[in-house]
Each structure stands twice: as C-alpha cells, then as structure tokens.
Amino acid sequence: MEVDEDIELQKHQEQQSRKLQRFSEDNTGLMRNWNNPSSRIIRVSRASGGKDRHSKVLTSKGLRDRRIRLSVATAIQFYDLQDRLGFDQPSKAVEWLINAASDSITDLPLLNTNFDHLDQNQNQTKSACSSGTSESSLLSLSRTEIRGKARERARERTAKDRDKDLQNAHSSFTQLLTGGFDQQPSNRNWTGGSDCFNPVQLQIPNSSSQEPMNHPFSFVPDYNFGISSSSSAINGGYSSRGTLQSNSQSLFLNNNNNITQRSSISSSSSSSSPMDSQSISFFMATPPPLDHHNHQLPETFDGRLYLYYGEGNRSSDDKAKERR
C-alpha cells in the first residue's frame, strides 16, 4: 500500500510540474495562457497539497481554491438569486452576475500580469518536487528491500517452527509406543490391606556372588480379632460348620512345611546371611504338637484366628462319635 501511494504521489507531482512549466516559456505565452481559463487549472493531490483532492486555479496571487466559502447572509442572497434565475448550478448564477456587472468590471484597474514571482515559485516547486521525488524513490526502494527481507525471515521462521512441531509430534508418538517397554519393574512395598494375599519376596544377598536372590514366602492371611487363648473353651466344640476355628492344624502345618522347605533351600544356597537368627527362626520354626481333644491354643501361639469352611482338622473318630 505504501509503495502504491509513493507511485501515485510521483505521478501527481510530475503532472503539476508539467502544468506549471507552461507558464515559464515567455511573457507572451504567459499572457496567452492567462487569457485561456482552461490552462490555468492545476490539479493538486491530497498527498502533496494537504486535504484537497480537487483542482486549483492559477491567479495573480498564486494558486487558489475553486471552492468559495460564503458568509451566511451572502449565501442566502446568492441561493435566492439562483432560484429566481432558475439555474441548477451555482456557477451559472455567478456567470450571470459577471455578465450583468461587465460595465462596472471594465472600470476596474488592470491586473498585474508580471509572473516573475510565479517563475521563482515554479523553480522552487520543481526543485522541491525533484528532491521529494528522489527521496521518496529512495525511501520506497529501501522499504521494499526491508519488506522483502522481513518476508524471507518470516518464511524461514515459519518453516523452522513447522519442522520443530513435526519433530516433537513424532518423538512424542515414538515415546508413547516404546514407553511401556523401556520401563523397568520396580520393587513394591507391600503395605496395603490386601498385601497379605500376595506372595512376599525377600532378597537375601549371597556373600560369594553378591547377587540378590528372590525367595518367595507365602503367608497365611491372618485376622487378629483380639481373642485370648482361654476364649476358645466357650465355643463348646465344633457343632456348627463355617465358624471361626482356632489352631487349625492342617493348613498351618502345610504352610509351615512349605516355609521350612524353602528356607532350607535358601540356607543351603547361601552359607552366611545378614539376617539375624531370630527372623530366621520365625520363618523356620515348627509348631508344637496339637491336641485334637483339648481345644485350647498353645502358649507360643499369639491367639490369631483363621477362617475356614468345613471341618478340616477333625479326625474321623470325632465325626463318628458325634453321629452316634
């Protein structure tokens, strides 16, 4: 847009300089042009002449605007005269007034037709136009170069941003696809309420190879109801099925047998262990002999109860006695 305005300004300045050049030939030419009203019309653009886009006329006092501002009273009288004459255009009413006052106009003194000051103004205008044209051309060229460089930088920046976005999207998609395979299994701390149902792994390092070994120990899910060993006598036997039974021999013995076997395997594979003897004895200890007829917990047992359905620890002799 600015380049177009500069070009338009140059065109108008050239037209103005060409029209002003008509009056600088000689005095006779100036008088001839002075008598020709059409040759005294000069068009001025808004860029060079300010607010006006219309043409101006050349007078003895320089360029003047064709539009005339009238006072309120004069404008009322003029438009009343125009309406009485029946003219559509104000210029026709002005022409009628000039013709009607021709006798009075001839009595007026003649105008000074010496246009030396106009030649000086013309030369100044030409120099100003030439300098302004050169400056505007240089400015337009520099602006064009700056805009071209700015467009190139913008294109390069846009291309770099696009490539970066594509690369980030590709890398994120690749990480999404391969993220599950790169993750290593982490050691979990079994502290929840449901951890008792899962096997627990204990790492026992070997003194010779310094490699950790995972030895799973399965623990029976215990529920501590805070019942002492003497409360088992209140139950009065095993008359009902699906009740809480204390000191279940079958499952507890099987579980301890499994623990003993696994502990013996681990102890045979490693001669020394950093664990203390008390923790080892907890896993490898065997329960004391149980009495099926005396339904009381031993002193070494901590009073924990286990829930079983059926009659897992009852012998066939007890069942036969109850049936009789």
Swiss-Prot record:
GO terms for biological process: leaf development; negative regulation of cell population proliferation; regulation of DNA-templated transcription. InterPro entries: CYC/TB1_R_domain, TF_TCP_subgr, Transcription_factor_TCP. Residues 122-215, 261-297 are annotated as: Disordered. Expressed in cotyledons, particularly in the vascular region, in leaves, roots, stems, buds, flowers and siliques. Residues 144-167 have a biased composition (Basic and acidic residues). It is found in: Nucleus. Residues 127-142, 261-281 have a biased composition (Low complexity). It comes from the Eukaryota. Plays a pivotal role in the control of morphogenesis of shoot organs by negatively regulating the expression of boundary-specific genes such as CUC genes, probably through the induction of miRNA (e.g. miR164). In association with ABAP1, exerts a negative role in cell proliferation in leaves, possibly by inhibiting mitotic DNA replication. Participates in ovule development. This is Transcription factor TCP24. It comes from Arabidopsis thaliana.
